[in-house]
Each structure stands twice: as structure tokens, then as C-alpha cells.
Swiss-Prot record:
Organism of provenance: Shewanella baltica (strain OS155 / ATCC BAA-1091)
Gene: ruvB
Annotated keywords: ATP-binding, Cytoplasm, DNA damage, DNA recombination, DNA repair, DNA-binding, Hydrolase, Nucleotide-binding
Residue ranges, annotated region (Large ATPase domain (RuvB-L)): 4-184
Biological role: The RuvA-RuvB-RuvC complex processes Holliday junction (HJ) DNA during genetic recombination and DNA repair, while the RuvA-RuvB complex plays an important role in the rescue of blocked DNA replication forks via replication fork reversal (RFR). RuvA specifically binds to HJ cruciform DNA, conferring on it an open structure. The RuvB hexamer acts as an ATP-dependent pump, pulling dsDNA into and through the RuvAB complex. RuvB forms 2 homohexamers on either side of HJ DNA bound by 1 or 2 RuvA tetramers; 4 subunits per hexamer contact DNA at a time.
Protein name stated in the entry: Holliday junction branch migration complex subunit RuvB
Family of the protein in this entry: Belongs to the RuvB family.
Entry remark concerning the domains of this protein: Has 3 domains, the large (RuvB-L) and small ATPase (RuvB-S) domains and the C-terminal head (RuvB-H) domain. The head domain binds DNA, while the ATPase domains jointly bind ATP, ADP or are empty depending on the state of the subunit in the translocation cycle. During a single DNA translocation step the structure of each domain remains the same, but their relative positions change.
Length: 334
């Protein structure tokens, strides 16, 4: 298994939560990046407010660490309603979901992270709640059992997932607003790093912020995590200010290279290049070669490498691109 404390993993770590909460934007105007998604949300939110209606159900999907939870909270803030948060694996029984639904007030947001991991029995309860704002509950057992319907106030379900394809078709079809989050560009990440530094009361210049941003794999959560480690280095080894020089040396010490790769990324790329002559190589063989699970490669390691053009996924398997060879100063065989 991949190490849980990998510095550049996009999944949330225990130390991220309290600090990320302080750095999160509260309203859409404070939210940086994802311009198309922001523009859509502004229209949908204003329209719902004009009609005095609950916002339509929303599915936010994309790689981890891009701000799905933050967007859900922003939606609640913009609508002026409460938000209740849970996750798919936590909702084990129908009663778990029923307890949440019956405590919602009109217009409230129910946020379910990892919604693709809902159990079938819980999902069945969710369908009438989403479509008709009704909750079907079974009373009694055996032949005497009967179903009663409870009316629910209009509410907005915001589901978040890193694996939209894992949702069942009936569940996916019930979301009126699907939003895909993309990896961030370096300019937007630099803005996020600068804003986070202000929250931390940390002196950072534009070049220092840029250096952290370009090694952050297009992911705000990673950018904020790297910023905290660079701050440590700046305070111990320098005068506390973050410049390009300080950021470069701090990140080199942390083994995060110019592309944002750590040893796991390099291990994956070099396995394709050295052990499989650049590929193509099947996922099972690649997983065995680097000692990782298929899911870890698909969900954690690959997305950024593919998006940045270091790996190609073909019907025959994974291939290392010319850019991967160039990164290691190797010559790609013809």
C-alpha cells in the first residue's frame, strides 16, 4: 500500500483539516480557479434565490484535493442555509440517512462525500427523497409491515466523488447540476498560495509562491501542505520569509521535484521505462512491478501523470511518453 503520509498525496491527511478550514474561501467571489464551474454556479444560485427555491441537486466530481467540500460549503453560504455533512461509507443503514433527512430545514444542503460508496439499501431511500422530497419508511416487521411516506422540506443534495463512473446510472441521473473540477493552472495556484500565506501571516514573494504552485500537481490541498513545510524551512534555515531560493531548497529537501513528483511518481515512470522498455504494460503487471494496488495507481498516481502528458493510457496498456524520458534525461527508443 502507498504510504499514508505521502507529502504530495491529494487525499486529505489528519493535519490538513483544521488548517484547511481556516484557509477555505467562504463565498464564490473568494474562490480562485475553476472559472467555468464558478460561472455556472453563480447563475444557478441566483436563479434559485430569485425563485425562492432550493437549489437543484448537485454532483461535484474530479480528482481529490480540488475543492469539492469547499464548493459545497460555499453553496450553502451563498444560499444562506445550513449544511449537514457526511460520507458514503458512514451511511451504513437506511436509518442513518433517514435521521439526517428528517432533521433538514427548508433549503438546507446535505453534503455526501464519497457518494459512490453508498450501499444499495441507502441509495434506494435516497431516490424518492431527491425526486419527490419524500421518505419511505417501513413500520413493523413480517406480514404486518407497512410503508408510510414522510414529507421532507425541499433540500439540496450535494454529492462529491472522485469516481463519477462508479455511481449507478439511476443515482447519477437524479443530479440536475453535474460539475467537474479540473486540475488548477499555476497562475491560480500561485494566487491560492499567496492567499493562504496571508492567512498564516507568512511573508512570501511572487516567485516563492510560483515555485510552490508549480510543484503542487495542480491541487490546492497539496499547495497548502507544501506551503506549511516551506514555512518550517524558512523559519529554521532562513529569516522566515519565503523567496524562490528558499522554496526551491525546501522542496528539494522534501524530495518534491520541479514537476511535483515524489519518489512514488518516479518509481512508476521508471518502472515503465526500465522494466517494460517504455510500454505498453498492463495495469496488473505495473502494479506488481512497483508493489502497489491497481486502485492506487488508477486513482492516486496516474491522473496527474496522464493529465500532464507523462503517461498515455492505451488499449494495450500504459506507455511512457517522450516527456517522461526527457524528465529523466533519457533518450526514448525509436
Amino acid at each position: 500500500m502507498i504510504e499514508a503520509d505521502r507529502l504530495i498525496q491529494p487525499q486529505i491527511q489528519a493535519q490538513d483539516e483544521s488548517i484547511d478550514r481556516a484557509m477555505r474561501p467562504k463565498m464564490l467571489d473568494e474562490y480562485t480557479g475553476q472559472d467555468h464551474t464558478r460561472a455556472q454556479l453563480k447563475v444557478f444560485i441566483q436563479a434559485a434565490k430569485n425563485r425562492n427555491e432550493a437549489l437543484d441537486h448537485m454532483l461535484i466530481y474530479g480528482p481529490p484535493g480540488l475543492g469539492k467540500t469547499t464548493l459545497a460549503m460555499i453553496v450553502a453560504n451563498e444560499m444562506g442555509v445550513n449544511i449537514k455533512s457526511t460520507s458514503g461509507p458512514v451511511l451504513e443503514k437506511a436509518g442513518d440517512l433517514a435521521a439526517l433527512l428528517t432533521n433538514l430545514e427548508s433549503g438546507d444542503v446535505l453534503f455526501i462525500d464519497e457518494i459512490h460508496r453508498l450501499s444499495p439499501v441507502v441509495e434506494e431511500i435516497l431516490y424518492p427523497a431527491m425526486e419527490d422530497y419524500q421518505l419511505d419508511i417501513m413500520i413493523g416487521e413480517g406480514p404486518a409491515a407497512r410503508s408510510i411516506k414522510l414529507d421532507l422540506p425541499p433540500f439540496t443534495l450535494v454529492g462529491a466523488t472522485t469516481r463519477a463512473g462508479a455511481l449507478t446510472s439511476p443515482l447519477r441521473a437524479r443530479f440536475g447540476i453535474p460539475l467537474r473540477l479540473e486540475f488548477y493552472n499555476i497562475k491560480d495556484l500561485s494566487t491560492i498560495v499567496t492567499r493562504s500565506a496571508q492567512v498564516m501571516e507568512l511573508d512570501i514573494d511572487a516567485e516563492g509562491a510560483f515555485e510552490i504552485a508549480r510543484r503542487s500537481r495542480g491541487t490546492p490541498r497539496i499547495a497548502n501542505r507544501l506551503l506549511r513545510r516551506v514555512r518550517d524551512y524558512a523559519q529554521v534555515k532562513h529569516d522566515g520569509a519565503v523567496t524562490k531560493f528558499v522554496a526551491e531548497h525546501a522542496l528539494d529537501l522534501l524530495d518534491v521535484d520541479s514537476e511535483g513528483f515524489d519518489y512514488m511518481d518516479r518509481k512508476l515512470l521508471l518502472a515503465i521505462i526500465d522494466k517494460f522498455i517504455g510500454g505498453p504494460v498492463g495495469l496488473d503487471n505495473l502494479a506488481a512491478a512497483i508493489g502497489e494496488e491497481r486502485e492506487t495507481i488508477e486513482d492516486v498516481l496516474e491522473p496527474f501523470l496522464i493529465q500532464q502528458g507523462f503517461i498515455q493510457r492505451t488499449p494495450r496498456g500504459r506507455i511512457a511518453t517522450a516527456r517522461a524520458y526527457q524528465h529523466f534525461e533519457l533518450i526514448k527508443p525509436e
